[in-house]
């Protein structure tokens, strides 16, 4: 298990020898101590990435792609180790780490490995006698900050397109869940990535993250996390006007119309909010039900939520694990009182499970709360836990108004058999993504991101590759003659 910083091709201690405790969310015990990057360590990492950039960006794109493909193979060859590490560190149920986190990580690196030599420029029709073509050039050194909820997948989402496009990387994983990212970079060294191309600096946001965001040698910063921290990233980045990409909070509306397939909608709504204990920016945390089917839906949905097996994430039978930290657990549980104070009804959950084997961990039961109003805090603020807020509507217009009533605009979903209603509603929801008769589907080829206070820029797909490049316009005087403008 690697615990040091990775700078310029080597695992090293922090300059000031600082460390951070990494805790097991199942019982609060110490897993290990990791090196804590300071501003000085970030400076060293940026210097290494700067030195590596000329050769890496000049490497044939097919060679960069080949290394990413080899990394994808290495991830699959070490799949069980990575799954165990991810579940131990984050609390993801091991069945999800095995079936989702690790395969999706490998798939993302493989996708961008194949994409590396397919990033094309263009030729612009201009006046006779001139040729104008546009190249896509890498930004340079990019800083990336990965959150604690899906460290393995988000590492691939960020590094894949950046490296394929020819950039070098300084990435800060969360100090809470850094272990799988450190293992990934170890595999990168093993498959032949050159020194300095990727540098990993786990550390606190107010030190390592702050320095990475403000560093004058970083050409772009890509951040996934809370909206409040995103604002600080933007402020810190202004010194050198670096490009900023933000994937921030969400309060996803999951609308169930009265003609929906209820069996599918109930299963989909449970997946939308309870997968990974609701710790997902795209979680369907607002369940918006047509009043004609609401009672039947809730009876069945609450029954399903109450039956979800909460347990040790390393237990193959566990369907939901702990929240990732004690601090986050305390924050999530405060929303139960907030909801009750505003007239909300707790239909199930709202407390820790009554299981002595889980008493030391950061566990909370799947929770369903019916809000009194769409303006209630529980319906407006991101809880980031297994808490779903139920709201009722009577017309399509009312459903749309509820969906668009928050400051967020990341994920959304709707369930209906009416094709016209589905497409019309999807086009009017103020969100970067909408799922119809499904929820939380992702693919490396499909752009992922939000609008409004959910951020800007996109992960994955061609959009991500473009976000890690600059358009370079080249003009050619075909015949070489230049008529005199200043005649003598």
How would you describe each model-predicted region?
Residues 28, 64, 86, 109, ...:
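Residue-level signal for inorganic ion chemistry
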Residues 220, 228-373, 436, 483-487:
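ALDH superfamily catalytic-core signature
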Residues 120-264, 393:
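Rossmann-like NAD(P) dinucleotide-binding subdomain of oxidoreductase/dehydrogenase enzymes
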């Amino acid at each position: 298990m690697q615990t040091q910083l990775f700078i310029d091709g080597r695992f090293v201690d922090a300059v000031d020898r600082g460390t951070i405790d990494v805790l097991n969310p199942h019982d609060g015990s110490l897993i290990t101590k990791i090196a804590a990057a300071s501003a000085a360590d970030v400076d060293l990492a940026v210097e290494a990435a700067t030195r590596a950039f000329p050769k890496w960006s000049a490497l044939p794109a097919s060679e960069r792609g080949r290394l990413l493909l080899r990394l994808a193979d290495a991830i699959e060859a070490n799949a069980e180790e990575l799954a165990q590490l991810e579940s131990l560190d984050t609390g993801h149920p091991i069945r999800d780490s095995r079936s989702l986190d690790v395969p999706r990580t490998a798939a993302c690196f493989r996708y961008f490995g194949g994409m590396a030599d397919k990033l094309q420029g263009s030729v612009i029709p201009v006046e006779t006698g001139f040729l104008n073509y546009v190249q896509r050039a890498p930004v340079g050194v990019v800083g990336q900050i990965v959150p604690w909820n899906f460290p393995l997948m988000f590492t691939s989402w960020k590094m894949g397109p950046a490296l394929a496009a020819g950039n070098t990387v300084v990435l800060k994983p969360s100090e809470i869940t850094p272990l799988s990212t450190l293992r990934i970079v170890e595999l990168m060294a093993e498959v032949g990535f050159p020194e300095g191309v990727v540098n990993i600096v786990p550390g606190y946001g107010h030190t390592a993250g702050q320095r990475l965001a403000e560093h004058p040698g970083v050409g772009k910063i890509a951040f996934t996390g809370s909206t409040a921290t995103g604002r600080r990233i933007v402020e810190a980045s202004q010194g050198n006007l670096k490009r900023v990409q933000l994937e921030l909070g969400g309060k996803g509306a999951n609308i169930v119309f009265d003609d929906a397939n209820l069996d599918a909608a109930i299963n989909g709504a449970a997946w939308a909010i309870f997968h990974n204990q609701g710790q997902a920016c795209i979680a369907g945390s607002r369940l918006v039900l047509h009043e004609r089917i609401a009672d039947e839906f809730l009876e069945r949905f609450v029954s399903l939520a109450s039956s979800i097996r909460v347990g040790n994430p390393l237990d193959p039978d566990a369907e939901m694990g702990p929240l990732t930290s004690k601090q986050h657990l305390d924050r999530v549980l405060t929303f139960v009182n907030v909801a009750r104070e505003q007239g909300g009804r707790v239909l199930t959950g709202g407390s820790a499970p009554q299981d002595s084997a889980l008493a030391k961990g950061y566990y909370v039961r799947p929770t369903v709360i019916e809000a009194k109003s769409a303006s209630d805090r529980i319906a407006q603020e991101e809880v980031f836990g297994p808490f779903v807020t139920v709201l009722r509507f009577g017309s399509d217009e009312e459903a749309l108004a509820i969906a668009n009533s928050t400051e967020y605009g990341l994920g959304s979903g709707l369930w209906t058999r009416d094709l016209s209603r589905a497409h019309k509603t999807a086009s009017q929801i103020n969100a970067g993504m909408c799922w119809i008769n499904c929820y939380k589907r992702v693919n490396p080829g499909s752009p992922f991101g939000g609008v409004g206070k959910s951020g800007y820029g996109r992960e994955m797909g061609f959009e991500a590759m473009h976000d890690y490049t600059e358009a370079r316009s080249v003009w050619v005087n075909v015949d070489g003659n230049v008529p005199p403008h200043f005649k003598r």
